[in-house]
Swiss-Prot record:
The keyword ATP-binding does not apply. It comes from Rattus norvegicus. GO terms for biological process: mitochondrial cytochrome c oxidase assembly; mitochondrial RNA processing; positive regulation of mitochondrial translation; regulation of mitochondrial mRNA stability. GO terms for cellular component: mitochondrial matrix; mitochondrion; ribonucleoprotein granule. Required for normal mitochondrial respiration. Increases steady-state levels and half-lives of a subset of mature mitochondrial mRNAs MT-ND2, MT-ND3, MT-CYTB, MT-CO2, and MT-ATP8/6. Promotes MT-CO1 mRNA translation and increases mitochondrial complex IV assembly and activity. This is FAST kinase domain-containing protein 3, mitochondrial. It is found in: Mitochondrion.
Amino acid sequence: MAFTLRRAFCHMSVFWMPGAVVALKIHPANNVQKAVRDCLRVWFCSLQPDLFRVRFYHAYCKSFHSENGNDLHPVGEPWFSQAQVWNQPEQTLKNEDEEMLSRRLNSFASFEEVLSFIHTLDTLPVTLASAALLRICEIGKRDDEQRLPKEVLENRVFQALCLRCERDPSHLTNAVLVTVLQSLVIDPQSSLVLSLVAECQRRLRRGSLEVHHLCVLGESLARLQGASCEILKLVICQLQSENLETFAPEDIVSVYRILQACPEEVDKHQTFLNTVNNFSLSIVSYLSPKSISHVLTALVALDQTHARPLLIKLGKSVVRYIPRFTNEELRQVLEAFVYFGHSDRFFTEALEQHVAAQCFSLDPAVASSVMEYCSRKRILSKPIFDVVAEIFVCQSEKFSPSQISELIEPFGKLNYLPPNAPALFRKVENVLFAHLRHFPPKMLLRLLHSCSLIERHPVNFMSKIFSPFFLQRLQGKESYLDRLSLAQMTQLFLTSVLECPFYKGPKLLPKYQVKSFLTPCCSLETPMDLHLYKSVVIGLIDLLGSRLYFASKVLTPYYYTIDVEIKLDEDGFVLPFTVDEDVHTRVALCIDGPQRFCLGSKHLLGKEAIKQRHLRLLGYQVVQVPYHELELLTSRLELVDYLQRKLFSQSSTVHW
């Protein structure tokens, strides 16, 4: 048997190796495998690499399983699996070979290239495995992906790499350790994550992690284990002891994101936050659009309203980057500006250019966010409003109910009708008819009320909103209807009476009608500018001769509050405000401060326009005294002359 085996091997040219033949001659047949194994291994792997790969694939095509479904461990792993081959002590690489392989790894530009290359290796030291993992994570970051895609996480070679590193994380570099943690999207309680976190904790306590690694680790811990993680608290404590001058711009962004994950501890970290806010002023110009949106989002979450210098500087950078923001980043920027009340002319102009350039490709979420920003800041940008109106008419099916509400309400609030107003509101009506049940009651009420502000009265829906069923839905589980909803319902009811006399449907019951539209918390009127009011009162006293001839802040029977009311008899003479008999005409003097107009314009807001419109329909003679006219007056004499022209013009029936 031994002779036959030796002769057969010796007659095969491919087996003609001195080591193998000698081994066969010396050792009996039953020891052939043991004696020849070492000599054949190098030959076998070099001769038939494809056979080795098939065996690797077969071993690692087993399904992976864990109790939580996320552990990167194979079930029923055969003894000759890839991970075990990589772990065999007999297989080592020379330093120069390992350096060459590392250089090749760094030359790859895709996940597939790295994984295919690792697939072909017979030997994989931990250092090379960690380099491969790092390269995979770097490719993900280059593609703007903080987390690795699912197809990579489920790849068998990648899973084998993770298993290799999990078994011996102490050999991983700091960069690999924190980067892999950052890139993995698996269960925080998986054995791989726990192993890597434990190793991070050991290095953290030794103080061997640099600033950048601390920042990456902190972000990963906040994502994986939340703000209550004890290790995260250690990371924050160590970051506070570091010199901010050593932080790269992306590290500062990471600090904000780490603290953002702990909003309940903002008071505890406020001193550190103040230092970071002040230092960040020097790095704003180095921040990418993505980083700027991250910082602004963190400032909102941490309620850093006092960081105005930083916000202003970030706002200037935002102007340059608007075309480069992703839809989500731009939406976050707009939300931050709304939260902090920030706006400037240059940002609005850049936003107008961006919306016009995007036009019909503008994302619905961004379009609604842009409109909400304009609404909150009272910015009447006709280019933006016109484009958005066209987008909605052509692509209304892309918008959700909440986005439709955010899109349409600003038209009413800012008192603007776009050129395609008939088509726009016809489309709104059609959408409401088709999807009315998808609009929550309060959202529907806000939408219909905003339409009425610009004389697009929702007559076809009034019977629905005045019905007991809608009022019940509007109240929901609360014990009462909120004050703002009742005020909007009341104004819609008044609109139906004054502007829609043909409406014959249900009316709003008196018990649901408010007594005044002017309230501190939820007003449908803008409070009077006290500085302007005092100036006008002085002028009126000089003009009329006494304070007895006019009344201030008069609540009418029709829910509106008049700034100044002057009563006239049938001949047009001014009556004392205490007289109720013989009153023929009531003059409503509207002292309109800047808050009653769109920002930086002479265009009245919708709620002020409907008020003046209703007062005229109720028989009042409305005289408007806007701030931009009062600001031109330089003396008390000019003020009196101005009021005289307003009240006693030739076309007026008022007599002095």
